[in-house]
């Protein structure tokens, strides 16, 4: 786990393995480079010619680009790491940093990843205020992440190096309350987000509904969160037909986990619901061969909800947050749900199963109705729900649907504020008819075109009347199969954790409805 601290030490005198500085493209449109604020002392060590040296080495200032060079004479750190911030703002040198927060976050992440194996690195990136310090710290801690639980000696096999051990932020104010709070927030959120990443990356032979529930129970106990776990017996008694139906084919029984964080000062109540399919084979409607090893990530929504609730507790937010983890393994067997079966859901509605690979909406439906019974001020569900959303938005954006346009906008804006890319999506009423069933109240499939929207319409059927609700389909960005970028690693990303935490913060502050 990477440590994060603030320091007022001079860059030249700090004992570290490296000093990280920012470099940007000239705002004038030419090919020149600009050394970003925060690196003045380092630039002085090169007699004011750091930009020229970097240009000679081929640096362009592009976002996330990393260039290493020997530190100036007299510096106690042997290496300078210059990381690209993209285009420099016109007022970047005169009026604060003016650099986009996400550019700072991604730059810090890229630098931290490039420094794997180092024990300590000083980050001299632009810090105009406490928010910048928190942003840079967040990016560095996320970028330093490495999943090495299954590697010999706990080291990443690709480079044989352990993650960067300590990040020291220069340019901040260690005794200032705002700076301290920003760093503490960054640590709490990133540690829980990285825990979500660990869960997503854990092989399905080790992570199943029961073991996931055990992880949630342990974390709840540690952070004073009330937890309730419904096993198969309790789910059967309660009539949770959706969760039971999806888990029917697996030797690992399903679970519904309820995490309740409460604040004595809370005036609002949020409910987060996460899809937790610990492995999705498709069931009887078996998935074709190819990339099935990534289907361990189908519990990313539940991991995000779990992490967000724990982060809210660690931050002591003045809002009640309930997390619902709908956990099941979708496997084919002689006891599995078949296409054509009818399930009676927790809400009392019946669902004709036309495709057992449309299982996420079934477990979510039960959890959404359970969440609705408590009449929260709003419900947000998170799920790797449809390939259709990936076709629509690609691998880096998640779709946002809601039964209230203003709330949908608020969710999209919260995501943008924390650097998560999303896009508002509609719930077209004409697509609802495609889910009509001659046998049951509704079918779990509808028209093929607009499949992500159909799934959202299905979920809406299980939200209590009068309750504000949003659905986040994170199928694209939840698991990165490409090369790492910015602070995003290969594998589980922890998408939506920061959005959920921000929604909780806004609600606590009275700025979200």
From Swiss-Prot:
Q: Gene name?
A: pepA
Which cellular component, as a GO term, is one annotated location?
cytoplasm
Q: Does the keyword Electron transport apply?
A: no
Enzyme nomenclature, EC number: 3.4.11.1, 3.4.11.10
Task: Please give one Gene Ontology molecular function term for this protein.
Answer: metalloaminopeptidase activity
The protein's name is Probable cytosol aminopeptidase
- Species in which this protein is naturally found: Streptomyces avermitilis (strain ATCC 31267 / DSM 46492 / JCM 5070 / NBRC 14893 / NCIMB 12804 / NRRL 8165 / MA-4680)
* Compartmental location: Cytoplasm
Biological processes, Gene Ontology terms: proteolysis
Sequence positions that bind Mn(2+) 1: 280, 357, 359
């Amino acid at each position: 786990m990477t440590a994060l601290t603030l320091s007022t030490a001079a860059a030249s005198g700090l004992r570290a393995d490296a000093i990280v500085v920012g470099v940007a493209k000239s705002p004038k449109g030419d090919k020149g480079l600009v050394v970003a604020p925060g690196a003045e002392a380092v630039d002085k060590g090169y007699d004011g010619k750091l930009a020229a040296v970097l240009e000679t080495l081929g640096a362009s200032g592009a976002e996330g680009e990393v260039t290493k060079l020997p530190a100036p004479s007299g510096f106690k750190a042997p290496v300078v790491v210059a990381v690209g911030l993209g285009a420099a703002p016109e007022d970047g040198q005169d009026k604060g940093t003016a650099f986009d927060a996400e550019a700072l976050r991604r730059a810090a992440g890229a630098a931290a990843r490039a420094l794997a194996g180092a024990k300590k690195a000083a980050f001299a990136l632009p810090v105009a205020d406490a928010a910048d310090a928190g942003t840079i710290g967040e990016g560095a801690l996320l970028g330093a992440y490495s999943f090495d639980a299954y590697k010999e000696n706990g080291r990443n096999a690709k480079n044989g190096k352990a993650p960067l051990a300590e990040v020291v932020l220069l340019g901040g104010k260690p005794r200032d309350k705002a700076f301290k709070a920003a760093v503490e927030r960054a640590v709490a959120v990133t540690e829980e987000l990285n825990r979500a990443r660990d869960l997503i990356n854990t092989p399905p032979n080790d992570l199943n509904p029961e073991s996931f529930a055990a992880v949630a129970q342990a974390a709840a106990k540690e952070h004073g969160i009330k937890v309730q776990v419904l096993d198969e017996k309790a789910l059967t008694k309660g009539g949770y037909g959706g969760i039971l139906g999806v888990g029917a084919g697996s030797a690992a029984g399903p679970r519904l986990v309820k995490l309740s964080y409460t604040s004595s000062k809370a005036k609002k109540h949020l409910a987060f619901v996460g899809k937790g399919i610990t492995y999705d084979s498709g069931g009887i409607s078996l998935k074709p061969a190819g990339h099935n090893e990534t289907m361990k990530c189908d519990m990313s929504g539940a991991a995000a909800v779990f992490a967000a609730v724990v982060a809210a507790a660690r931050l002591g937010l003045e809002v009640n947050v309930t997390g619902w983890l709908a956990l099941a393994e979708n496997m084919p067997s002689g006891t599995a749900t078949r296409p054509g079966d009818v399930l009676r859901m927790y809400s009392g509605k019946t669902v004709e199963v036309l495709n057992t690979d449309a299982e996420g909406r079934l477990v979510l439906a039960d959890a959404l109705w359970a969440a609705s019974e408590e009449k929260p001020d709003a419900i947000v569900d998170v799920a790797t729900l449809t390939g259709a959303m990936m076709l629509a938005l690609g691998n880096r954006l998640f779709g946002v649907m809601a039964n209230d346009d203003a709330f949908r906008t608020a969710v999209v804006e919260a995501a943008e504020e924390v650097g998560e890319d999303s896009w508002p999506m509609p719930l077209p009423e004409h697509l609802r008819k495609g889910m009509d069933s001659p046998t049951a109240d509704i079918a779990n499939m509808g028209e093929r075109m607009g499949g992500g929207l159909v799934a959202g319409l299905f979920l809406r059927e299980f939200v209590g009347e009068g309750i504000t609700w949003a659905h986040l389909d994170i199928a694209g960005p939840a698991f990165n199969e490409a090369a790492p970028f910015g602070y995003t690693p290969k594998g589980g990303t922890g998408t939506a954790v920061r959005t959920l935490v921000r929604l909780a913060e806004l609600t606590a502050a009275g700025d979200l409805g």
